[in-house]
Amino acid sequence: MTATVASTSLFTTADHYHTPLGPDGTPHAFFEALRDEAETTPIGWSEAYGGHWVVAGYKEIQAVIQNTKAFSNKGVTFPRYETGEFELMMAGQDDPVHKKYRQLVAKPFSPEATDLFTEQLRQSTNDLIDARIELGEGDAATWLANEIPARLTAILLGLPPEDGDTYRRWVWAITHVENPEEGAEIFAELVAHARTLIAERRTNPGNDIMSRVIMSKIDGESLSEDDLIGFFTILLLGGIDNTARFLSSVFWRLAWDIELRRRLIAHPELIPNAVDELLRFYGPAMVGRLVTQEVTVGDITMKPGQTAMLWFPIASRDRSAFDSPDNIVIERTPNRHLSLGHGIHRCLGAHLIRVEARVAITEFLKRIPEFSLDPNKECEWLMGQVAGMLHVPIIFPKGKRLSE
């Protein structure tokens, strides 16, 4: 059967770019309310963007992700805009093509490889802390959360780390620009830069991931320029925005949750597990799927050409999957959250984001154990397919640089 949703349903107006914010400036109250409705109606129809399905239940999202025949990753970004003759490699592809391309970059993102960045991340984090520790104030989002992943991603791709603002603008076009024309215009800038980088790396390859991909072959054939542009785009996107928004939300939480902060300071061995629980609660991403054939999920029948938006933050609060889902429980194990995806498209950098968060939290709490939200400035939540805190102004006792 094809279910219908009452006009009073929260699903009807659900829009990841315009999520209602609560008194704390976050959408978490709305997430909980939609979760409550999803307990009886896990999938609903939203009128936003010409109409699309909102999938909110944990098992329903799993069902969509696992059914790669009926749901294509060509709908991963929504609303969609024209990206030219290439795709968002891996994230915007389906198997068997997806698998072949993913294998090219799987090794640099393995736990063994990403653990090697720990010391580099530690140094980078402390350099950033040094830049403001004598001031006693700063925006933890722009000062730390944006910069930590941007610097590492630039190094991985062989880009100048100091051009982080440019990279974030390109990423913004994919995850936060609602206007398709504006998004395509900014995206064209990214493409032009990628073409220049690819041409340079063909003649002067380095040790970075882009050089590795450029010099690789699939079925005996070198990758086309369009494929390489797609690779550059998805590696930039996955490396910068998701981690930045997650870390921003974590700093925001630690600024006011004194009990959690002091517990992690007293027991730093809990930080790795806390990172996973914070990922469950503040996972930044939602993804779309394009329906390619008629399919029924639960009691909802979807038609070819429709889009299904997977609301991971709602599934991460599903009471059938998690005990006390509205609370941060850092001892939670196992923690089968969906914040990093599921199945064949599980986030390639899943281990890297954990390493980045673990190092950032550990080093920050060592240097600045006491801090709070700045009462004279406003925090700001960013909505979109990648959501999280955009500004987190904090104050803290002035300290000394490590170099002194």
Curated annotation (Swiss-Prot):
Its EC number is: 1.14.14.133
Presence of the UniProt keyword Cell membrane in the record: no
Task: Spell out the Pfam families in the cross-references.
Answer: p450
Name the Gene Ontology molecular function terms of this record: heme binding; iron ion binding; oxidoreductase activity, acting on paired donors, with incorporation or reduction of molecular oxygen, NAD(P)H as one donor, and incorporation of one atom of oxygen
**Where on this chain does substrate bind?**
242
Extract the coiled-coil ranges from the record. Answer: none
Q: Gene3D superfamilies of this UniProt entry?
A: Cytochrome P450
Which reaction does this enzyme catalyse, per its entry? 1,8-cineole + reduced [flavodoxin] + O2 = 2-endo-hydroxy-1,8-cineole + oxidized [flavodoxin] + H2O + H(+)
Which CDD domains does this one have? Answer: P450cin-like
Sorted UniProt keywords: Heme, Iron, Metal-binding, Monooxygenase, Oxidoreductase
UniProt enzyme class: oxidoreductase
GO annotation terms (biological process): carbazole catabolic process
Which pathway does it serve? Answer: Terpene metabolism; 1,8-cineol degradation
Q: Where is this site: Controls regioselective substrate oxidation?
A: 242
Q: What does this protein do?
A: Involved in the degradation of cineol (eucalyptol). Catalyzes the initial hydroxylation of cineole exclusively at the pro-R carbon to give the (S)-6beta-hydroxycineole. Cineole is the natural substrate of CinA.
The entry assigns this protein to a family as follows: Belongs to the cytochrome P450 family.
Protein name as annotated: 1,8-cineole 2-endo-monooxygenase
Q: Which organism is it from?
A: Citrobacter braakii
